[in-house]
């Protein structure tokens, strides 16, 4: 099973970052606009439409307010297994770190998944840095 870990830092406050991340039905407006263009909530899940046209159903495993961590599992697409998590970590000097981990099969999808994660994190950083400027 392949595993990727990516992280970014932002000037946005950790509580504001977590508020946007935990809003599981608003990826396309509050966290990664452009990377995700639509999010529709279903019982225990969300249907996510990415900017490249890919649609996936993501089962929401947990939204942990104490740890500021969300876990989901993607269903559909080219992967036979996908488990993702994202965590908001308060850092030094008013900086907030976001850690995104993806575990998936088949291993051969690593390149494509890594590119998607990098694109998603770039959109997230832009959105969150803009949020920091408006506080």
Where are these regions (language model features)?
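Hydrophobic ligand-binding cavity/cleft-lining segments
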Residues: 1-42
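Residues at beta-strand starts and edge strands
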Residues: 2-4, 54, 68, 82, ...
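A short, structured loop/turn motif at beta-sheet edges
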Residues: 11-15, 62-66, 88-97
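Short beta-strand-to-loop capping motifs
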Residues: 10-12, 50, 74, 104
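Generic structural detector for well-ordered beta-strands
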Residues: 7-11, 49, 59, 87
């Amino acid at each position: 099973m392949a595993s990727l870990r990516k992280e970014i830092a932002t000037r946005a406050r950790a509580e504001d970052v977590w508020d946007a991340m935990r809003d599981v039905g608003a990826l396309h407006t509050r966290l990664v606009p452009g990377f995700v263009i639509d999010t529709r909530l279903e019982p225990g899940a969300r249907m996510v439409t990415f900017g490249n046209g890919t649609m996936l159903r993501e089962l929401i495993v947990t939204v942990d307010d104490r740890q500021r961590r969300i876990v989901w599992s993607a269903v559909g697409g080219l992967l036979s297994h996908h488990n993702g998590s994202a965590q908001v970590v308060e850092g030094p000097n008013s900086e907030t770190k976001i850690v995104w981990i993806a575990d998936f099969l088949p291993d051969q999808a690593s390149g494509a998944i890594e590119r998607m994660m990098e694109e998603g994190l770039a959109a997230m950083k832009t959105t969150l840095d803009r949020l920091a400027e408006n506080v």
